Regions:
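Conserved class I S-adenosyl-L-methionine
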Residues: 1-39
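Conserved S-adenosyl-L-methionine
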Residues: 45
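Class I SAM-dependent methyltransferase SAM/SAH-binding core
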Residues: 49-95
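A short acidic, Gly/Pro-enriched loop at the edge of an enzyme's catalytic core
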Residues: 97-104
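Residues lining the SAM
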Residues: 108-110
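A short glycine-rich, Lys/Arg-flanked "PGG" loop and its adjoining helix->strand segment in the class I
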Residues: 122-134
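SAM-dependent methyltransferase
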Residues: 139-211
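C-terminal lobe and adjacent flexible extensions of AdoMet/dcAdoMet transferase-like proteins
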Residues: 201-231
């Protein structure tokens, strides 16, 4: 599983259009509807901790897991600034370990798509089930194959900011349903730019595949919604 390295430095800059507050409100609303208003919550694939921080601000005792040391360094800086008591763990989400169980697990921003083998997805879901309290809730979002095939596939995204720029090239293999992201990042240092290159892979899953993985993990599907809706 790929970890963000050079991109971590500019991740929040280029993701400043992501509606983290809206996502947090949406996720927290579902948690509260299911009676989870406080207690331990795991943010699986937490990245730089943007949603982790917001959920901590709502009164949840947060744990964040990510496999990128660079991303967690930024998350820790946010934690120091906010004063929130968040535990961050540098772990691969496919093999994460906790000290005990939690009331809920969330995994936002298509983190589960980075697991490119269905067998490993089922194993990850089984781990989630293992660390959930009885009656606990697992909330996650994922990109379907449609998004990779019709929206992202073989497109190039580029942005130029004052202090950094990036080129994001997508190459989608419809047979394997794997989307390759080739990232080229330039970060200003004085009068020059430092260049980073990274390659990441995500898999486009069908709804059937995901529900099968949940069933194999021993979990019950409560609901499946389109983003920001209850439909």
């Amino acid at each position: 599983m790929d970890a963000y390295t050079g991109f971590a430095e500019v991740y929040d800059t280029f993701m400043d259009n992501v509606p983290y507050a809206e996502w947090t409100e949406y996720y927290a609303g579902i948690l509260k509807e299911n009676g989870i208003r406080d207690g331990l919550v795991l943010d699986l694939g937490c990245g730089t901790g943007s949603m982790t921080e917001l959920l901590a601000g709502l009164g949840y005792d947060m744990i964040g897991v990510d496999n990128s040391e660079e991303m967690l360094e930024i998350a820790s800086e946010k934690k120091a600034a906010s004063g929130h008591d968040i535990l961050y763990l540098l772990q691969d989400m496919r093999e994460f370990e906790l000290y005990g169980t939690v009331r809920a697990v969330i995994s936002a921003c298509d983190s589960v798509n980075y697991i490119t083998e269905p067998e490993e997805l089922a194993e990850t879901f089984a781990l989630v089930n293992n660390y959930l309290d009885p009656g606990g809730l697992f909330l996650f979002d994922f990109n379907t194959e449609y998004k990779y095939r019709e929206i992202l596939g073989d497109t190039t995204i580029a942005e130029n900011r004052d202090e950094c720029s990036f080129i994001w090239e997508n190459f989608y293999d419809p047979q394997e349903r794997i989307n390759e992201y080739d990232l080229t990042i330039f970060v200003r240092e004085g009068e020059l730019y430092r260049k980073f290159e990274e390659t990441h892979f995500q898999r486009g899953y069908t709804v059937r595949e995901v529900t099968d993985c949940l069933r194999k993990a021993g979990m019950e599907l409560v609901a499946m919604y389109d983003g920001f809706t209850k439909e």
